[in-house]
Curated annotation (Swiss-Prot):
EC number(s) given by UniProt: 2.7.1.17
Family as reported in the entry's similarity comment: Belongs to the FGGY kinase family.
GO molecular function: ATP binding; D-xylulokinase activity
Coiled-coil residue spans: none
Described function: Phosphorylates D-xylulose to produce D-xylulose 5-phosphate, a molecule that may play an important role in the regulation of glucose metabolism and lipogenesis.
Name the record gives this protein: Xylulose kinase
GO biological process, one term: D-xylose metabolic process
Record key words, sorted: ATP-binding, Carbohydrate metabolism, Kinase, Nucleotide-binding, Transferase, Xylose metabolism
Annotated organism of origin: Bos taurus (Bovine)
Gene from which this protein is expressed: XYLB
Amino acid sequence: MAERAARHCCLGWDFSTQQVKVVAVDAELSVFYEDSVHFDRDLVEFGTQGGVHVHKDGLTVTSPVLMWVQALDIILEKMKASGFDFSQVLALSGAGQQHGSVYWKTGASQVLTSLSPDLPLREQLQACFSISNCPVWMDSSTAAQCRQLEAAVGGAQALSLLTGSRAYERFTGNQIAKIYQQNPEAYSHTERISLVSSFAASLFLGSYSPVDYSDGSGMNLLQIQDKVWSQACLGACAPRLEEKLGRPVPSCSIVGAISSYFVQRYGFPPECKVVAFTGDNPASLAGMRLEEGDIAVSLGTSDTLFLWLQEPTPALEGHIFCNPVDPQHYMALLCFKNGSLMREKIRDESASGSWSKFSKALQSTGMGNSGNLGFYFDVMEITPEIIGRHRFTAENHEVSAFPQDVEIRALIEGQFMAKKIHAEALGYRVMPKTKILATGGASHNRDILQVLADVFGAPVYVIDTANSACVGSAYRAFHGPSLLCLVSIY
C-alpha cells in the first residue's frame, strides 16, 4: 500500500508558444516524468514557424487553435504508450502563453460535455471555434484599439491604476476589440472567450473553465484591486463581453473534477481535481517558489524581472498581476529589451570578445564606478521607451566614451540600477529576508551576479528554470486541493 501511495502525483501542463509540455511531480515535489510535443516539428501540417503564423502585415500573429488541441491528443497518447499510470493523478493544473485568446462557437459547450472516449479531441472539436487562428502575445496589430481603450478610461495612467498595465497591443481586451470591429459576425457567433490557459483547462474539465485572476490581469480588463471585470473597459472593447468571459476566480481555485472523457479514455480517477490554469509567467513565479520580498531575474536576450508585491503602485512601465499563489498579494513583471545582446556588444568592444577579460574589468573597478554611470540601449528599449548610449561622469557631464574597464562596469551597474528603480516605482521594497533568484545566460558569470547583489543589497542564487511554468503548475495542482488555499468553486 505504501508503494502505491508513493506514486501519487500531480500533473503540470504548459501550453506555450512553441510546444505543449507536461511534467508529473510526486508528493516530495520531485519531477519523475516529462514529455512534450513541439508544434513545428511534430505538427508540420499546420505550417507554423516558432509555433505561430506571422501575417503579411508583419503585425498580426496567430496560432491555429486545433494545433493546440491535437498536441494534447498526441502527448496523452505518448504517455499512455509509455505506461504512465493515470490512475495515480490526484490533481492537475497548467499554464498558457499569456494574453492569447480562444473563441468558442455557439453550441461548443454541448460538444465539450458529451465527448466520446473512442475519438481524439481534435476530431470532435473541429467545428467548435468561431475563430480558427487565435491572436497570441506576439501580435502587435491593435494600436488603434489600445488608444481607444485608454481614452475611454481617462488615459494610460488611469488604465494602469485600474488594470495593472497601460494598454498593450498584445493584451487580450484590445485583441477582442479588434475581432469585434473587423469580424463582427464571428464575434456574434462566439459564446465564450477563453485565455489560452482557461481554454486548456476547459479541455480537461469538459466544460468552460473560468479565467483566473492572475492570467486575467494580462487583459487590460480586470480591476486588479477588486478582482472584477471593469465595466468601463468591457464597454470600450465589445458588447456583451462580460457574459462571454464568465466570472473570474482566484488562481488556486479547484474549478472542477476531470471530464469523464479522460477517465474513460486514459484511466484518470474520476475524483482527479482540475486547479485553475494560469499564465506562463505567473506559473513560473510558483515554479521558482518566490516568496514575499523575493525577485527573480531572467538574464536572457531580453531581461525580465519577477517581483512579489504586497502593495503595488501600477505605473506606465511594467505590469502588475494578481499573485497566483496568494490571492491577497500581487506580482509584477518588468521586461527590458536590451539584455544579453547589449552585454555581448560591450564585451566585444571593450574586452576583445572575452568574458574572462569582462570579468576582470568588473573585479578591477569599484562598486559605484567612481560615480561614472551609463545607460546602453542599442535597440529601442521598452522600459522606458528610449534608444542610444548615454554616459555621465561623477560631475553629471555627458561624455561620448569611457575607458574600457569603466565602460563595462557602467553597463552592468546601469542595467541593474534601472531594474531596481523600475521595481521600486511599482511598489517593490528590499526586505531583510529578500533573496534574488537569477537565471539565464548571464547568471553563469559570478562577477555580473556580484554587481546584481551589490545594487540590490541582497544575496543572489542561481536557479534552473527550464521547466518553471510546467513545474509551477504541478506545484499549484498540489497547492489547490490542500488546506493552504481554501478556495473551491467545485
